[in-house]
Amino acid sequence: MNPSDLASASPAPVDTNASPAWQEQFAFLADLIPQLVWITDPTGFHTYFNQRWIDYTGYDLAASVGPDMWNNLLHPDDQQRAREVWGHSLATGDDYSIEYRFKARNGGYRWFLGQALPRRDAEGRIVAWFGTCTDIEEQRKMREQLEAAYSDLEAKVMFRTLELEREVHDLRKKLADQPGLD
Amino acid sequence: MLYYCMSDLLLDINLQQLPDDYLAGHWQVASRVLNQNNPASPLALATRLQLNPGQLLAEAPGLPEAAAGTWAVQRDELLQRPYLRFNLPQEQTNALVTRLRRSADGQHSQLNLYFASGMEMQLEQSEFPRL
């Protein structure tokens, strides 16, 4: 996406205190960065998605109401864990961080790092959660390849060690079987 | 060429639960790194390995006939994966199974072996349906 196309790409977040110009700049910046960006109210209801979110997931704010979006978006193996982690952050105000798989519009899953921080008012009450989802599919693949390579290497070393032990054992047996040698 | 197009569709098989019959069949040698292995040995020269029940045939171009011997699947509790015992008149060696990948329909397989000499070999198998 060309940055020049972004000015009116996604709706600006609703913030009655912010000027229209500021809201437009926020939306421009949020659409420019490579992450999916979202904002929720203190109870976890979404109030803003950037254009990348909408383009990747196919869900805009209107479609995000209710449980369907998360049930459809999240990989079935990640849904329970995601609910628990997000629920913990909402209940405690702790920073949110999780790796999970999101389904794209085309039906394929990719790994994302979801992170969010609460924004608080002067009294320390949470007024909103600001979150991003960073595509880590390639890093996950690299990590899995590295883990597989390490596991292979470990197995090879063990295999060669056992082979060497067998050879030493056979050699000792041959020497022991030779008459005149102790 | 069709096989290579499909290689992305091959799935890793858990080597701790690998059925022995997944290793049998007629394998093409796709690639090989000799390392310390004798380059003139039958397995170093082979372009095709037939792992039939109880019988091993190592075929190499330029040789009048395939080297014939036996093979067997071995397991050691210290290793988390099986290894193969190859017995040929000119060569007796073991090879660790480092990876086995198969298509969902079992028609295509890719087998990686690591020999005691350090030789690494990738074998491929395709069973196209007969028309």
Where would I find each of the regions flagged by the language model?
Chain A
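PAS/Per-ARNT-Sim sensory domains
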Residues: V65-D68, N72-H88, I98
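PAS-associated C-terminal cap
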Residues: M1-Q25, D77, T134-A148, L153-L164, ...
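PAS/PAS-like sensory domain cap-loop motif
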Residues: W53-V65
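Sensory-domain cores of signal-transduction modules, predominantly PAS/LOV
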Residues: Q35-L36, T43, Y96-E99, K156, ...
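Per-ARNT-Sim (PAS) sensory domains and their PAS-associated C-terminal
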Residues: A91-D94, I98-A116, R125-V127
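Conserved hydrophobic beta-strand signature of PAS-family and PAS-like sensory domains
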Residues: H46-T47
